[in-house]
């Protein structure tokens, strides 16, 4: 196994031109739209391959194991995202802090932040792994997963959570690289790991007939490969962000700064999952077929959220470096440019998926009822994608400046509270699937409005604009 990892690292090393090619990017100077797009696209493609882990699981499980297995895997999505999103938020905190130090050219603080971040990844990964192993069944039962798929869903979730430590390490490691403007190496590693995932999915599920357990194990192996590759890269780097394993420890002042930004960012991300879990509970009441249809829709819908997450990560890093360099006018120009890019992507994806979504649906299931119901959801929800863009861009801009608490509050009110209130008090009067999921565009519009209002005050306080 170890020689395989060494070969993969050497292959990536030569593909990217080795250490002689400087993959870092200084966002404090240059053409803004070009910098954002060149940084954005590797993140987007990388997000696609990361999503491919679970998507390939779903396709192979749906085709090889049937509708019940598909529903079992799909029913775990919101709970796994709840935990995963929190450590992604922590990695955002690390990325912002390192980006600010990088923009300020503070080498000592970069060194401390890198090693503190890795220690945080290890500790948080252990905690989340233990949580998943011991409480998966109870959590799935609490959200109303039907008993005919509960055992399979619990098995998949427990095996998935075995990968929390390598998952946390990869997210922190890639966050470090992105903080210094390198979004290409994380992409290369994800491509390799996606290939590993597909191969092991085929072997374990199709050939060895290990069912959903095989799919979860394949994902675990792929996540481990990702963690090893990004760690090797950081260890052999000659730049200021080089990782030394013996120096991994907490530096308390830096840790406090990372947690101050990362914890609210993580909580903000988990709020989406909490609201979605509440909605999933109501969706589960419509039966196994609807659960399967919704799980397929969520996989297609993920294309939009990958794009938003990528542009959000791009503007956060851009702002972080410029905030560290005190270039406030450039920050405002970057936010406007990122918003224009986000709106263009939202409208384009809405059109493409509304017209071509049915073809993608057929990749996941051959059941006509699932295909028709999923297409109905696509036409009902996706035209409203544009209404979310302000949330991602303004939130990323504020976070890059070190302000993470206020965006969390706005998301709590506009997404979590409002969405839960809708399904609790309004949707029971309209007992259909659409009566539940219409809460999505309603909360997108509302939260964007809240961010627009607050961002005007934020600019005056931070930039004097």
What positions do the PLM features span?
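Small-residue-rich hydrophobic transmembrane alpha-helices
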Residues: 2, 70-130, 167-186, 293-357, ...
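N-terminal transmembrane alpha-helices
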Residues: 27-64, 78-93, 97, 122-129, ...
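Transmembrane helical elements of multi-pass membrane transporters/channels
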Residues: 38-57, 159, 170, 193, ...
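Interfacial/gating helices of multi-pass transporter permease domains
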Residues: 61-81, 147-152, 212-213, 254-261, ...
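Hydrophobic transmembrane alpha-helices of multi-pass small-molecule transporters
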Residues: 82-85, 197-202, 227-231, 303-306, ...
């Amino acid at each position: 196994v170890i020689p395989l990892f060494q070969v993969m690292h050497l292959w990536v090393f030569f593909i990217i031109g080795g250490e002689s090619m400087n993959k870092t990017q200084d966002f404090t100077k240059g053409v803004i739209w070009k910098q954002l797009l060149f940084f954005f696209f590797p993140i987007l493609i990388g997000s696609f391959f990361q999503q491919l882990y679970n998507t390939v699981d779903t396709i192979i499980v749906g085709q090889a194991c049937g509708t019940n297995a598909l529903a079992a895997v799909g029913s775990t999505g919101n709970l796994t995202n709840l935990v995963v999103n929190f450590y992604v938020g922590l990695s955002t905190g690390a990325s912002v802090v390192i980006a600010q130090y990088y923009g300020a050219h503070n080498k000592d603080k970069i060194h401390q932040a890198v090693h503190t971040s890795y220690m945080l990844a290890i500790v948080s990964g252990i905690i989340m792994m233990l949580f998943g192993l011991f409480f998966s069944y109870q959590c799935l039962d609490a959200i109303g997963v039907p008993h005919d798929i509960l055992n399979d869903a619990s098995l998949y979730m427990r095996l998935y959570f075995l990968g929390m430590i390598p998952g946390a390490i990869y997210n922190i490691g890639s966050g470090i690289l992105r903080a210094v403007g390198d979004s290409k190496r994380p992409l290369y590693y994800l491509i390799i790991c996606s290939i590993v995932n597909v191969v092991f999915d085929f072997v374990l599920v199709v050939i060895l007939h290990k069912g959903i357990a095989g799919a979860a194990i394949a994902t675990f192996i792929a996540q481990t490969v990702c963690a090893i590759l990004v760690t090797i890269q950081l260890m052999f780097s000659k730049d200021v962000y080089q990782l030394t394993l013996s120096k991994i420890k907490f530096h308390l002042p830096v840790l406090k700064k990372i947690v101050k930004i990362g914890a609210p960012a993580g909580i903000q991300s988990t709020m989406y999952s909490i609201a979605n879990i509440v909605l999933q509970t109501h969706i589960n009441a419509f039966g196994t077929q609807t659960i399967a249809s919704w799980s397929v829709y969520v996989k297609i819908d993920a294309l939009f959220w990958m794009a938003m997450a990528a542009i959000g990560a791009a503007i956060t890093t851009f702002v972080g470096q410029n905030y560290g360099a005190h270039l406030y006018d450039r920050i405002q120009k970057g936010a406007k440019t990122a918003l224009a890019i986000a709106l263009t992507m939202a409208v384009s994806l809405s059109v493409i998926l509304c017209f071509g979504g049915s073809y993608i649906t057929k990749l996941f299931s051959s059941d006509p009822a699932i295909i028709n119901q999923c297409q109905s959801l696509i036409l009902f929800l996706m035209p409203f994608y544009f209404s979310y863009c302000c949330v991602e861009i303004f939130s990323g801009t504020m976070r890059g400046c070190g302000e993470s608490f206020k965006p969390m509050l706005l998301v709590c009110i506009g997404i979590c509270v409002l969405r839960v209130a809708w399904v609790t008090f309004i949707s029971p009067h309209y007992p259909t699937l659409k009566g539940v999921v219409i809460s999505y565009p309603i909360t997108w519009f509302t939260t964007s409005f809240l961010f627009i209002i607050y961002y005007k005050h934020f600019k005056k306080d931070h930039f004097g604009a």
